[in-house]
Regions:
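N-terminal cap/lid segment of alpha/beta-hydrolase-fold proteins
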Residues: 1-24
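Active-site glycine-rich loops that stabilize anionic/oxyanionic intermediates
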Residues: 37-40, 118-119, 252
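Conserved alpha/beta-hydrolase
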Residues: 49-75
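Alpha/beta-hydrolase active-site loop
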Residues: 81-102
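Alpha/beta-hydrolase-fold enzymes
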Residues: 124-211
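Short beta-strand/loop motif that positions the catalytic acidic residue
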Residues: 248-250
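Conserved alpha/beta-hydrolase "acid-adjacent" motif
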Residues: 255-263
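Catalytic active-site module of serine/aspartate enzymes centered on a nucleophile-bearing elbow/loop
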Residues: 277-323
Length: 323
């Protein structure tokens, strides 16, 4: 197996250089485009990429605006999408990256799957509601269902910070509202981000990485709020085809989503989707790619990708035979 690894840039919807990595196979059986979470970066997914390469899948990932090299190499602050229309630009960047991936693989007919973690799961869900035929399926890790009362509180406190601070200042109130209680369920915490994983080595590495764990601006949360709102209502799922493959994967002790993914999956089923699954991992927290039982997670991802790829092939073969 030969992997063509490269770091590159592509243009975002407004011309901004978006920094990305590819782990590309010459003849993959499928392709995965990954969207990372908040206050982290694409290079944390290298092991995941290598695992999927070994299973026969090409892997692509980019640093969102306000994250990783997309922020730093453009001399832009970490934790700030854009001064205007940040969420729309994040969605547009995914579209541009997908178009580049399709162009690079134009002679290969294989399914393209979307993987989204945490904030990336919100981006993924909003994207597939808007562009339901762009991907062959989606895997969502560390996802959450934001309640209407939570949306109301977020909107109120974002407005409060906007009024007293302005949009470009780092948020304190909203930041605390979202994250301050995440460690409370655990007795073994040494660092503020230990809720991410029960693997202390992984959380230590995150804590010591200057490209992780940064505070975000008031405008960032204002943009993110739009994504949360777009994905909060069942009516917004109606654009997705009923047989679109979707799986939610969460640590049972994840304070962000946890067992709430059961209700989240049910909401998609209520919208008419028939190919929705979920799995909870006992004792696991937010970042399944860094948990002690990550091998089980990797195996589940590969098995799901293989299963959905084969289902799609059977469907295509049946269509050809019926003609």
């Amino acid at each position: 197996m030969t992997v063509d690894f490269a770091e590159y840039t592509f243009k975002g919807r407004d011309g901004l250089d978006i920094f990305a990595s590819r782990y590309e196979l010459a003849e993959p059986k499928g392709i995965v485009l990954a969207l990372h979470g908040m206050a982290e970066h694409r290079k944390r997914y290298e092991e995941f990429a290598n695992i999927l390469n070994e299973a026969g899948y090409s892997f692509y990932i980019h640093d969102h605006r306000g994250h990783g090299e997309t922020a730093l190499e453009n001399n832009l602050p970490l934790g700030h999408f854009a001064d205007k229309d940040g969420w729309e630009k994040i969605i547009g960047d995914v579209k541009n990256h997908l178009e580049l991936i399709e162009k690079r693989n134009k002679n290969i007919e294989v399914p393209v799957f979307l993987f989204g973690h945490s904030m990336g799961s919100f981006v993924s869900r909003d994207y597939i509601s808007r562009n339901p035929y762009d991907f062959s399926g989606a895997l969502l890790s560390g996802a959450a269902q934001v309640k209407r009362t939570e949306l109301f509180l977020l909107k109120f406190f974002i407005g409060l910070e906007k009024f007293f601070k302005g949009e470009k200042k780092k948020s304190t109130i909203v930041e605390n509202l979202i994250f301050s209680s995440n460690n409370q369920s655990f007795n073994d915490t040494e660092r503020p981000d230990d809720w991410l994983s029960s693997n202390s080595k992984a959380t230590k590495k995150y804590y010591e990485d200057p490209r992780c764990g940064f505070n975000c601006t008031v405008k960032f949360y204002d943009d993110f709020y739009k994504g949360m709102k777009n994905t909060a209502y069942i009516a917004n799922y109606n654009t997705i085809p009923e047989n679109f493959p979707l799986i939610f994967l969460s640590g049972e002790k994840d304070p962000v989503g946890g067992k709430d993914i059961i209700k989240l999956a049910d909401n998609y089923k209520k919208a008419g989707l028939k190919n929705v699954e979920y799995k909870l991992y006992p004792e696991a927290r937010h970042e399944l790619i860094n948990e002690y039982n990550k091998e089980e997670f990797f195996e589940d991802v590969i098995n799901w990708l293989d299963k959905k790829k084969n289902e799609q092939k059977k469907k295509e073969d049946k269509g050809v035979n019926e003609k």
